[in-house]
Structures are given as structure tokens and as C-alpha cells.
């Protein structure tokens, strides 16, 4: 085995937003650099600068290639493809140059645009893919609205990914369910996301507040949550719901009007860095997602002593929540039962406390020290 102070390069689109992948990459990069003493570089393609939304150690270097694939989102399909191929060619050239310059021991990709060519870069590094989405949502296209040629293109593209994943030295997924999603692959390892908080206290569970944290998107299910809350607020007239999320809340404001939801007790906020503070000011965490690669928000809330309610969607929640023990799992997408579970927790401080204590114990499995050790063992194994 080589000197175990490895050079690690992370390839991920961006660090500037408040997404789960950005949070996890930042936490692990900090641990690898500050605790394990690795030489860590993160290479991004998006954002005007390399600034991270989440805290990033001074020991972690960031290289921004400035390709800005995100500017293609509003282009027509044909123009998008032509410009994408041009940017992709430049990305391959720039990333190859950086990897040949850095000569990392290990290159980790979050399986975005570089997965199409990263195995062909002969820089001598081991290549690890890190999958943060369920298979059904990896490179998903909404077939309800897409033209037939777009559907064909994306399905063809998606199938080609399997070959690229097979060539990786290792593919890391977040749950055991996710392992079973990829029967074609024999190079899989399960390592969960790490808890990103250093929690020093626990919620008193006395505030009359339900909280959720995520992204204003279809996958996160806030349209469903508002329908659920329209039931809850009628029975629990002194409780409030606070949603902290990145993205545009405008469609949800309209939905609140349509459902006659009391805006004095249901608040749509932008994303926050200090999520621990919001957990500690709350008494229940809800996660109404249609799909989750893992469910880091659940672990964070549990670490702060909150009972949690989540749909039993693929893939993450069932690996974290034991229904009726440290939280509630609700069959997708049973709005009435979800509302009843919230009301049940609102009605009993003892139940909130019992579930919160069990959840807090469960969250210890995801401490960065534990997860980081699993990554270290993987690195050592690959570098033998």
C-alpha cells in the first residue's frame, strides 16, 4: 500500500447551492482533509466563483472550470444538445488537464457529466462513483411532457451509463435497497451519507412547530405536504408549519391560496445554512418526498431529538426509520394517514419524546467518524 495520505479529487457540478449533495461533499471533504490529512481538491463546473454554501475547510482546494452547463436549461432541445456537446468536449479537455497535473490517487465523481468520459482519463487514479439518487431518478426525463425524440435520446443516453458505471473501480450507493437496484453491477459498496451536524443539544419538543427542509421541487413533494397540512391545521389550530427550501416557492404560494391555508401558520422560507437551529426550535420533522436517494434531513432531525414522519418512498427513509419506533413511515402517498400521524405526535409530548430519544440514538450510526472510517477502508482497499 502507498503512503496513506492520499490525494483525493472530487468532481461535482457546484458547491454554491444548498443541496444535499453539496452538503455531503463539503462534510466529507473537510473530514478527509482535516482529520485524515488527505490532500483534497474539489473540481466544479458551475458558479461564478468557487464559494461553498456550506462551510469548507481552508485545507480543501476548489477549482472552478467555469463551464456553466446550467445556462443551457432554458434553451431549445436541439440548441441545448449542440451547446452541451461543445461544453462537454471542453470539460473533458479541462478535467483531463487538471487530473494529469494533480495526479490524484483517487478521483470521486458524483456521476454527473464527467461519468461519460472519466474512465478514459489515464491519470493513474482509481475512479469511484458516488450515487446520490435512486436508479429510477438518475438522469430522469419527465415523459409526460417530452417530445418523442427527446425521450428516445435520453433513454438511449441512460442505457449507455451502465457501461460507464461498470468500468468504475467502485460505485458507492447510500442504502442496501440501492445496491439491489443495480443487478448488472458487481463493483458496488454501500456507504451512507454522514451526519453533517455537530449536535450539542436536543429539542425540548415543546414548541408548536412542524418543520421540513429541502428543495422546492416535484420530487420533494411539498405540494402533497400542503394538502396534508390543510387537514392538520384545521384540528391543531395553534401549531404552525415552516418549510425551508432552495428554489422558487411561487407555485406553492398559489396552492396555499387554493387550499385556503392560513398563511400566518404556514411559512415558506428560503434555504438556511444553520439548519440545526431550526430543528431545535421545532417539535416534529416531516418529509413528504416522492423519492429520496437517502434522506439526510431525517438523520439531522433525529440527531436533534425530533420525531420524524416520512413517506416510505424509495430508497432512503426505510433504511433510517423503524415505523412506530423512532418515527413514522407512511405508505406513498396516503395523505390522510400522514396527516393523522402528525396529529398523533402533536397530541402527545410523551410520544414525541420517546421517538425523539430513539431517533437520536439511531443517528449516531451516521456520525462522520463512522462514515469517514468506511471511506478510509475503501480507499485503502483500492490502493493496495
What is each stretch, according to the model?
Residues 177, 194:
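Carbohydrate-associated surface elements
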Amino acid at each position: 500500500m502507498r503512503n496513506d495520505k492520499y490525494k483525493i479529487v472530487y468532481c461535482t457540478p457546484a458547491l454554491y447551492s444548498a443541496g444535499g449533495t453539496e452538503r455531503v461533499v463539503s462534510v466529507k471533504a473537510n473530514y478527509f482533509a482535516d482529520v485524515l490529512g488527505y490532500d483534497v481538491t474539489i473540481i466544479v463546473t458551475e458558479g461564478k466563483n468557487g464559494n461553498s454554501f456550506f462551510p469548507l475547510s481552508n485545507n480543501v482546494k476548489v477549482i472552478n472550470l467555469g463551464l456553466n452547463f446550467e445556462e443551457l436549461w432554458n434553451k431549445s432541445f436541439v440548441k441545448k444538445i449542440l451547446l452541451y456537446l461543445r461544453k462537454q468536449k471542453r470539460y473533458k479537455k479541462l478535467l483531463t488537464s487538471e487530473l494529469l497535473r494533480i495526479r490524484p490517487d483517487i478521483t470521486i465523481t458524483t456521476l454527473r457529466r464527467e461519468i461519460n468520459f472519466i474512465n478514459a482519463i489515464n491519470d493513474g487514479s482509481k475512479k469511484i462513483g458516488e450515487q446520490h439518487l435512486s436508479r429510477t431518478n438518475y438522469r430522469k426525463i419527465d415523459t409526460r411532457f417530452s417530445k418523442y425524440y427527446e425521450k428516445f435520446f435520453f433513454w438511449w443516453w441512460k442505457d449507455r451509463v451502465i457501461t460507464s458505471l461498470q468500468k468504475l473501480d467502485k460505485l458507492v450507493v447510500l442504502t442496501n435497497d440501492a445496491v439491489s437496484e443495480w443487478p448488472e453491477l458487481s463493483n458496488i459498496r454501500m456507504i451512507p451519507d454522514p451526519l453533517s451536524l455537530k449536535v450539542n443539544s436536543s429539542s425540548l419538543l415543546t414548541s408548536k412547530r412542524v418543520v421540513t427542509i429541502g428543495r422546492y421541487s416535484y420530487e420533494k413533494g411539498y405540494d402533497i405536504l400542503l394538502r396534508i397540512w390543510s387537514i392538520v391545521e384545521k384540528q391543531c389550530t395553534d401549531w404552525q408549519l415552516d418549510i425551508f427550501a432552495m428554489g422558487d416557492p411561487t407555485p406553492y404560494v398559489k396552492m396555499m391560496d387554493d387550499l385556503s391555508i392560513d398563511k400566518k401558520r404556514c411559512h415558506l422560507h428560503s434555504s438556511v445554512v444553520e439548519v440545526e437551529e431550526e430543528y431545535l426550535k421545532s417539535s416534529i420533522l416531516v418529509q413528504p418526498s416522492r423519492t429520496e436517494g437517502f434522506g439526510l434531513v431525517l438523520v439531522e432531525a433525529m440527531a436533534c431529538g425530533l420525531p420524524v414522519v416520512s413517506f416510505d418512498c424509495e430508497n432512503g427513509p426505510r433504511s433510517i426509520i423503524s415505523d412506530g419506533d423512532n418515527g413514522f413511515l407512511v405508505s406513498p402517498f396516503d395523505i390522510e394517514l400522514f396527516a393523522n400521524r402528525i396529529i398523533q405526535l402533536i397530541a402527545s409530548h410523551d410520544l414525541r419524546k420517546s421517538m425523539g430519544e430513539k431517533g437520536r440514538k439511531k443517528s449516531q450510526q451516521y456520525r462522520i467518524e463512522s462514515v469517514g472510517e468506511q471511506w478510509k477502508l475503501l480507499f485503502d482497499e483500492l490502493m493496495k
